[in-house]
Amino acid sequence: MQKFTLHKGLVAPMDRENVDTDAIIPKQFLKSIKKTGFGPNLFDEWRYLDQPGQPGVPESARKPNPDFVLNQPRYAGASILLARKNFGCGSSREHAPWALDQYGFRAIIAPSFADIFFNNSFKNGLLPIVLPEATVSQLFDEVHAFPGYELTVDLERQVIVRAQGAEIPFEVNAFRKYCLLNGFDDIGLTLRQADKIRAFEAERLATKPWLAHTMPA
């Protein structure tokens, strides 16, 4: 998993409440057995006019919706998503943070997130940041007012730095912060204990050798 320490990026405003995971990545794109390739279909039903979108159709063959925020030139290359309350509600599909990450987003700022989406984001290197609703609304005003609006997210110091230098503090669980700073997903954390796991398996097979044998068919 990619480390997250400090990130400066262009902000895109998703000015909708209750954005659910089916809007983030529609169900027909979940058939893949791979963990990659979801970025082109992020927000598919809003992002393209030719609906319903289908797996396997190249992005170049689609008809973009010019009114959708991510298709507007001023937000091209955005890596920080500014959202409204209850972002990521709906089903528990882990494909939602995968799609956001593979599109290029590193952080999402909102007044609140659905619990499962919130947890899945941390496990996939995407930083969800909860701020007071009034602060989020102020950021929306600034993004709309200033083209090319950027923020710097400093995870180590737990602050968001505005362009003019003003800082907005945010809270993050200490263990989740540790994992993001070091790029540890669940597998990475487990592999840090590889020596202990091997020692346990060796001791187990030495004292209970019958466990090494398979049952007859």
From Swiss-Prot:
UniProt KW Amino-acid biosynthesis keyword: yes
Transmembrane stretches, start-end: none
Class of this enzyme: lyase
EC number: 4.2.1.33
InterPro entries: 3-IsopropMal_deHydase_ssu, Aconitase/3IPM_dehydase_swvl, AconitaseA/IPMdHydase_ssu_swvl, IPMI_Swivel, LeuD
A Pfam short name: Aconitase_C
UniProt GO molecular function: 3-isopropylmalate dehydratase activity
Entry superkingdom: Bacteria
Pathway: Amino-acid biosynthesis; L-leucine biosynthesis; L-leucine from 3-methyl-2-oxobutanoate: step 2/4
GO cellular component terms attached to this protein's record: 3-isopropylmalate dehydratase complex
Sorted UniProt keywords: Amino-acid biosynthesis, Branched-chain amino acid biosynthesis, Leucine biosynthesis, Lyase
One record GO biological process: L-leucine biosynthetic process
Reaction(s) this enzyme catalyzes, per UniProt: (2R,3S)-3-isopropylmalate = (2S)-2-isopropylmalate
SUPFAM superfamilies: LeuD/IlvD-like (SSF52016)
HAMAP family, per the entry: LeuD_type1
Known function: Catalyzes the isomerization between 2-isopropylmalate and 3-isopropylmalate, via the formation of 2-isopropylmaleate.
Similarity field: Belongs to the LeuD family. LeuD type 1 subfamily.
NCBIfam families per the UniProt record, alphabetical: leuD, PRK01641.1
Complex formation: Heterodimer of LeuC and LeuD.
Protein name: 3-isopropylmalate dehydratase small subunit
Species of origin: Paracidovorax citrulli (strain AAC00-1)
Annotated gene: leuD
